[in-house]
């Protein structure tokens, strides 16, 4: 049990906070995507070109869908945190911890299946096997090297998911602080 006295539920406020923190984390994640080519040692612009080839979605629409998905994840995270006493965000450090756990869950349940079952086979079929005219030889070599060293991508993306889950939890802790001000805490953290 995370608290001795319960605070009143405010679902509409929780949804608003979830939208806000999801958008904040989504924009922060998008800022990381702007430099992902350099961080992974790829030619400039290859990340978004690969998204277009793998999923058939234009980069601007992909950015919009990603930010919408992060807003939905923020709402779900805050609704679960409000309704499950163990994960109720009554302090900012607890928000950071539960956000990191939430980021790891999103990585495991959403990113890994999409990466392994959709993205890698689509890149292999559309780019590497068919020699797409949209990609230069240097870009195809970089993608081949990256897919062979796939663990680097998985570790990097796991790190990014946990970091931005922590940002989402931090922002939730800041915004929900007043709601749980009078809640008696057990060992000051939970």
Segments (PLM) and residue ranges:
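Juxtamembrane/disordered regions of integral membrane proteins
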Residues: 2-190
């Amino acid at each position: 049990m995370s608290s001795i006295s319960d605070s009143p539920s405010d679902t509409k406020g929780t949804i608003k906070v979830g939208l806000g923190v999801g958008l904040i984390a989504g924009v922060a994640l998008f800022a990381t995507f702007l430099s992902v080519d350099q961080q992974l040692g790829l030619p400039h612009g290859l990340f978004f070109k690969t998204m277009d080839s793998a999923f058939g979605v234009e980069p601007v629409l992909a950015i919009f869908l990603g930010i919408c998905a992060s807003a939905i994840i923020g709402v779900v995270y805050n609704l679960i945190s409000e309704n499950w006493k163990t994960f109720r965000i009554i302090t900012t450090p607890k928000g950071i911890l539960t956000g990191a756990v939430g980021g790891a869950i999103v990585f495991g349940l959403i990113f890994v299946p999409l990466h392994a079952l959709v993205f890698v086979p689509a890149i292999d079929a559309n780019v590497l096997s068919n020699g797409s005219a949209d990609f230069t030889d240097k870009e195809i070599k970089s993608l081949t090297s990256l897919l062979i060293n796939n663990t680097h991508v998985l570790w990097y993306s796991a790190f990014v998911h946990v970091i931005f889950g922590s940002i989402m939890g931090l922002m939730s802790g800041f915004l929900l602080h007043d709601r749980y001000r009078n809640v008696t805490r057990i060992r000051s953290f939970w």
